[in-house]
Amino acid sequence: MLTMGTALSQQVDANWQTYIMIAVYFLILMLLAFTYKQATGNLSEYMLGGRSIGPYITALSAGASDMSGWMIMGLPGSVYSTGLSAMWITIGLTLGAYINYFVVAPRLRVYTELAGDAITLPDFFKNRLNDKNNVLKIISGLIIVVFFTLYTHSGFVSGGKLFESAFGLDYHFGLILVAFIVIFYTFFGGYLAVSITDFFQGVIMLIAMVMVPIVAMMNLNGWGTFHDVAAMKPTNLNLFKGLSFIGIISLFSWGLGYFGQPHIIVRFMSIKSHKMLPKARRLGISWMAVGLLGAVAVGLTGIAFVPAYHIKLEDPETLFIVMSQVLFHPLVGGFLLAAILAAIMSTISSQLLVTSSSLTEDFYKLIRGEEKAKTDQKEFVMIGRLSVLVVAIVAIAIAWNPNDTILNLVGNAWAGFGASFSPLVLFALYWKGLTRAGAVSGMVSGALVVIVWIAWIKPLAHINEIFGLYEIIPGFIVSVIVTYVVSKLTKKPGAFVETDLNKVRDIVREK
């Protein structure tokens, strides 16, 4: 019986082409960074690409930065372990992303420009609610920094696992290598480089997610592979088996998080015009649906693949790595490993840039002042670059000793943003009665409920399954209630809010 490490190490040692393919991929990313470095003369260009991004880059960069290593490693591993029932999460995510394009994207693109040309979510909240004391901006900025540092560390864990599994290299070496490349092109190239590389990486990811399950089926039993998977364990192809109502709701509820994920909705803020969003939506949702179905297919075919090839799979989340190395020529295998790196690094780079934006725009600018920011753009761009480096170092330190699955790490951070920001974004875009006190209270209560649920409530799931509910649900509900109630009880905003909301609505309706 082959162990994953020995089989793959022998194969990679014998085929240097794999290394060449990875090296070429890294070189392309670094060249892109240098190419777009000149387009980062001011803070808006470095952080938001000057709001000049087209629909196709918007679509694939949003998808690539959203899915991360979770789509290629986490989801196939979950399907391999639990069967088709893990697909509920893909249904929830696809529906959430689709609604996001309709409900959030157009208004956010228009409103952020109208509200003082805000380039970060906290900056938008501040301008939307006339937060002269910057309380809302500081708290929302802190939430971004804390949760994104945790989120980014999950990407570094994925990178370390990849090099450890595929090449038999030390986990820490892989972690540092991935970190270096991501930091390099984010540090120098800014938002435009990140968006272009995400587009490029999104294409690679899609090809990989279609290719691997098809070739696996061709090498197994064709469409009969699914019959074999069901024969091994009937529940493997049952969408409901093994899941309670609480389990289904928990997986489905991942879609709630989309409205408040800063690294995703910033893509809507940077598109050239809200009129381009329908094109972006059609491509983005199609890419997502095909990619997620491919990931599910990898997991299902993997159930038959592992015993057929006598492989001892020690970590289900490395299933895609194993299949790509065993089934393909080293050059193609190298391309597929590049797809995993694409998934990992596209998300890390987007998260680093959003966190850097928050540290620079929401904190450093408060210290240096608005006038200084207008007169010395180079200083602020440099602070943005240094912030990328600082956040990455902290995330690497946390990832140095991984102690959880990629899916759990991503899930915790996703819930944190979903409960903190999703209700607030929706209220800010649609409700004239939202107040600063309501926004702060709802945002903080949502974040606290998520933290408390993870730390103290979820461990009680063995007592009653309700305690195992995905933390985004109680966090989202509490945030909505608190935001609404506190807003009703506090001083109403000025008439300018209703005027702005009406203006945003009218602009969005323009064809």
From Swiss-Prot:
It is found in: Cell membrane. It is a multi-pass membrane protein. It comes from the Bacteria. InterPro entries: Na/Glc_symporter_sf (IPR038377), Na/Pro_symporter (IPR011851), Na/solute_symporter (IPR001734), Sodium:Solute_Symporter (IPR050277). Keywords: Amino-acid transport, Cell membrane, Ion transport, Membrane, Sodium, Sodium transport, Symport, Transmembrane, Transmembrane helix, Transport. GO terms for cellular component: plasma membrane. GO terms for biological process: proline transport. Its main location: membrane. PANTHER family: SODIUM/PROLINE SYMPORTER-RELATED (PTHR48086), SODIUM_PROLINE SYMPORTER (PTHR48086:SF3). NCBIfam families: Na_Pro_sym, sss. This is Sodium/proline symporter. The gene is putP.
